[in-house]
């Protein structure tokens, strides 16, 4: 609770577990919902769907679900990730973004919405020289007209490295270019 209070005191929007964050972005109400799917026996689907329904009832026009899921170093999402991602979209999430595996797991378009399974590490201080420095930035534009949200299919995926140095982690994420960018996105 101390961390939440510190973030609140600093005016930093935070969310997760039992807290949905709302932000006004150019007059559009955006809901940010956090979930955690790593503890054995922890079924978060019902809580996540309830949070999505709460966000909708509170007038959120865009609902982004961030979930901490997956098995470390696995480059392919597990069936539990796919099922939960699909459930989030089916419940009304506009976008699902995952983290935890420490590697890129790619993304899919499901029922007209994107699920990004894992972005990789991006800015990671847990290892001075991780063997996999690949990560990506996922950008998507939404057009809101009244209560209708249209996603722009012209997404932008930017391949990156968590470091500008190949021999160590200097904590300076850097966009990749050329063959390196192609390799990361392959």
Located regions from the model:
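Acidic, metal/ion-coordinating pockets
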Residues: 3-186
């Amino acid at each position: 609770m101390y961390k939440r209070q510190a973030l609140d005191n600093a005016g930093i929007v935070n969310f997760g577990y039992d807290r949905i964050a709302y932000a006004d972005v150019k007059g559009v109400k955006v809901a940010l919902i956090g979930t955690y799917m790593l503890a054995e026996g922890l079924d978060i689907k019902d809580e996540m769907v309830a949070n999505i329904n709460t966000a909708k009832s509170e007038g959120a026009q865009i609902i982004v679900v961030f979930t901490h899921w997956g098995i470390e170093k696995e480059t392919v999402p597990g069936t539990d990730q796919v099922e939960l991602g699909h459930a989030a979209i089916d419940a009304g999430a506009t976008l699902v973004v995952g983290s935890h595996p420490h590697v890129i797991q790619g993304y899919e378009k499901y029922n007209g919405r994107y699920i990004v399974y894992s972005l990789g590490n991006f800015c990671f201080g847990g290892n001075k020289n991780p063997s996999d420095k690949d990560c990506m930035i996922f950008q998507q534009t939404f057009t809101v007209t009244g209560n209708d949200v249209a996603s722009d299919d012209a997404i932008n995926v930017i391949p990156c490295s968590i470091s500008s140095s190949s021999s160590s982690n200097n904590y300076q994420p850097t966009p990749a270019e050329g063959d390196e960018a192609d390799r990361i996105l392959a």
